[in-house]
């Protein structure tokens, strides 16, 4: 694999992304549902795109979340929904949309108690932890992330009650319903104001990081690592798990 000519160099100013332009495009661009590239398209359990080209906007996120609200009972989830976001700028904007739709639909969202980023494994573990001794009112989750995609990209994926990636039967149902809503100009989407949603009883703080880190020694021999007196250097490179290493 060829090494990029800019590998190992500082970011150039001309490569910076325009946050104001991204935010404006996210909130004001309405996708052309006749264009396949602007429809909701689920890949590995989620939808990814850019606000600038009309493939990841507030309309997309709202429609996807309403679709989840419409179908999650069929997927076996009637309890809370765990929400995590990564470090991409669009994730911050989409996070507000997610809470607005969930709260308007009366779905309880468990969010990070200190407003930190939440990596996918932590959301998966939270779902399993919650569901482990329950037979009903099971939880599912949403992770707001385009994974490894560039900084100007956004994404969102759904994890069902199993904690892992959603299967094609689930993603197809969400995709179809979301596109139906988009075709109707999201008239079937329930939303409330961002501030109202955050202050509602449907948004509940949850200690993702503390609980996840505390459970690591149940699967990792921490004493052996300490006794080996290894010196380990970690660079999270802007990943959403960066603060998990500190803790």
Across the structure, where does each feature detected by a protein language model lie?
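Gly/Ser/Thr-enriched, mixed-charge loops and adjacent short helices
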Residues: 2-38, 134-135, 154-247
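N-terminal small/polar loop signature for handling phosphorylated ligands or for N-terminal nucleophile
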Residues: 20, 82-153, 247
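N-terminal glycine-rich anion-binding loops that anchor highly charged ligand groups
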Residues: 31-44, 48, 71, 76, ...
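Conserved phosphate/anionic-ligand binding catalytic regions in large, soluble enzymes, centered on
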Residues: 37-56, 146-149, 236-244
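Acidic/glycine-enriched edge-of-secondary-structure segments
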Residues: 46-61, 198-206
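Phosphate/oxyanion-binding active-site loops and adjacent basic polyanion-contact surfaces
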Residues: 56-66, 90-91, 115-119, 205-213
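Glycine-rich phosphate/diphosphate-binding loop of Rossmann-like nucleotide-binding domains
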Residues: 58-65, 71, 85-104, 230-247
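Glycine-rich phosphate/diphosphate-binding loops that line cofactor/substrate pockets in enzymes
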Residues: 65-81, 189, 221-228
């Amino acid at each position: 694999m060829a090494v990029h000519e800019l590998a190992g160099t500082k970011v150039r100013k001309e490569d910076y992304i325009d946050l104001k332009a991204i935010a404006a495009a996210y909130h004001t661009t309405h996708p052309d549902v006749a264009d396949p590239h602007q429809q909701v398209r689920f890949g590995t359990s989620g939808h990814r795109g850019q606000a600038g080209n009309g493939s990841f906007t507030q309309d997309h996120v709202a429609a996807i979340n309403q679709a989840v609200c419409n179908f999650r009972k069929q997927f076996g989830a009637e309890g809370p929904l765990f929400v995590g976001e990564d470090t991409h700028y669009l994730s911050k904007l989409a996070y507000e949309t997610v809470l607005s739709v969930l709260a308007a639909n009366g779905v309880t969202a468990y969010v990070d108690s200190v407003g930190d980023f939440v990596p996918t494994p932590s959301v998966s573990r939270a779902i399993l932890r919650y569901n482990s001794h329950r037979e009903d009112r099971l939880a599912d989750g949403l992770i707001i992330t385009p994974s490894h995609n560039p900084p100007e990209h956004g994404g969102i994926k759904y994890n069902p009650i199993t904690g892992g990636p959603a299967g094609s039967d689930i993603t197809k149902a969400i995709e179809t319903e979301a596109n139906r809503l988009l075709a109707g100009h999201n008239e079937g989407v329930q939303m409330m104001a961002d501030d109202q949603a955050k202050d509602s009883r449907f948004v509940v703080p949850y200690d993702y990081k503390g609980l996840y880190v505390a459970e690591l020694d149940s699967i990792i021999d921490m004493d052996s690592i300490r006794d080996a007196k290894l010196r380990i250097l970690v660079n999270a490179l802007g990943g959403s798990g960066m603060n998990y290493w500190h803790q």
